């Protein structure tokens, strides 16, 4: 049976494991360092099989050997962002975690595609790529799928349309410098830039940028996990099924958009083995300038890594 492993059984990891097993295209292994947590959550999820009708198995483990032969490994392990905590402050702790996770995952699944969710995700995706030694297209991070989902929600509410009618385009850092692209965000096929004023577009963009922090402020003791897990599940499905679907993801750039040796959110075509193609949009001067500013933010984070 094909296998997908989820590293980290916190809110994002466990909810993702649930979403993946309900899609029923592969067995799912949920791994965590805390004994009992992945086992208990996997057992709970497995007991919904007769209700939901999925046939594949979900298991929980503390042993990386259980992940052996995974086609895709999703890395959610890391501490959750707390109120007032920036993504940058997560870096030192999550770097150590990522180093251990990548080493163990590739020991048992050397052919796996890595999907990185741990924050700050652009920098963690870069770190996973460097640590793994994998080709750049076999390492991809959560970015614009989630940010775009947030944007689509607010655009849909503003215009009175179904969120599924919005095809969002959010590029750059998954963080405060992310770049919403109104010209490339489509609502029923029409550019957002033609449907709202520049001021309204900026207002919607700011709401999307602050979407994660807004949830953290409400929850007080945690961060978002429903939309993030749904976003990652969509990415995993596109990779596993080889759909060729275009999504905005954190990707290693090598000349695209004039950038090299950096991970940044850009449109990519996902398929078997990870990223099949990086889409280069015809950005105007202002759009490109904003993307370059966002890139500088990520470069500063990458420079602080201990590599």
UniProtKB/Swiss-Prot annotation:
Active site per the UniProt annotation: 174 (proton acceptor)
Residue numbers binding substrate: 81, 87, 119, 150
A Pfam family reported for this protein in Swiss-Prot or TrEMBL: Ldh_1_C
Keywords: NAD, Oxidoreductase, Tricarboxylic acid cycle
Enzyme kind, highest EC tier: oxidoreductase
InterPro entries: L-lactate/malate_DH, Lactate/malate_DH_C, Lactate/malate_DH_N, Lactate_DH/Glyco_Ohase_4_C, Malate_DH_type3, NAD(P)-bd_dom_sf
Binding site for NAD(+): 8-13, 32, 94, 117-119
GO biological process: lactate metabolic process; tricarboxylic acid cycle
KW Oxidoreductase (keyword) present: yes
Gene3D superfamilies: Lactate dehydrogenase/glycoside hydrolase, family 4, C-terminal, NAD(P)-binding Rossmann-like Domain
Catalytic activity: (S)-malate + NAD(+) = oxaloacetate + NADH + H(+)
Entry's Gene Ontology molecular function annotations: L-lactate dehydrogenase activity; L-malate dehydrogenase (NAD+) activity
Entry EC no(s): 1.1.1.37
Family from the record: Belongs to the LDH/MDH superfamily. MDH type 3 family.
Function per UniProt: Catalyzes the reversible oxidation of malate to oxaloacetate.
Protein name per the record: Malate dehydrogenase
């Amino acid at each position: 049976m094909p296998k997908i492993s989820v590293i980290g059984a916190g809110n994002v990891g466990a909810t993702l494991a649930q979403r993946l097993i309900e899609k029923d295209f592969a067995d799912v292994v949920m791994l965590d360092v805390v004994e009992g947590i992945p086992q208990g959550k996997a057992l709970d999820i497995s007991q919904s099989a007769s209700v939901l009708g999925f046939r594949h198995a979900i298991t929980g483990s503390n042993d990386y050997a259980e992940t052996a032969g995974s086609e895709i490994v999703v890395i959610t392990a890391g501490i959750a962002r707390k109120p007032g905590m920036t993504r940058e402050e997560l870096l030192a702790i999550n770097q150590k975690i990522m180093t251990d996770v990548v080493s163990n995952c590739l020991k048992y699944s050397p052919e796996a595609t890595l999907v990185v969710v741990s924050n700050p995700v652009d920098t963690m995706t870069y770190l996973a790529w460097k640590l793994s030694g994998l080709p750049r297209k076999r390492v991809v991070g959560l970015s614009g799928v989630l940010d775009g989902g947030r944007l689509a929600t607010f655009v849909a509410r503003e215009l009175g349309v179904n969120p599924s009618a919005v095809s969002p385009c959010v590029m750059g850092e998954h963080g405060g410098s992310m770049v919403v692209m109104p010209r490339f965000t489509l609502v029923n096929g029409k550019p957002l830039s033609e449907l709202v004023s520049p001021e309204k577009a900026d207002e919607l963009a700011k709401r999307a940028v602050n979407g994660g922090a807004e949830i953290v402020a409400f929850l007080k003791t945690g961060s978002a996990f429903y939309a993030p897990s749904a976003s990652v599940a969509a990415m995993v499905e596109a990779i596993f099924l080889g759909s060729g679907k275009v999504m905005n993801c954190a990707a290693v750039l090598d000349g695209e958009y004039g950038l090299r040796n950096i991970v940044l959110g850009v449109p990519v075509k996902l398929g078997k083995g990870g990223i099949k193609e990086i889409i280069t949009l015809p950005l105007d001067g202002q759009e490109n300038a904003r993307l370059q500013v966002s890139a500088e933010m990520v470069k500063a984070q990458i420079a602080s890594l201990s590599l």
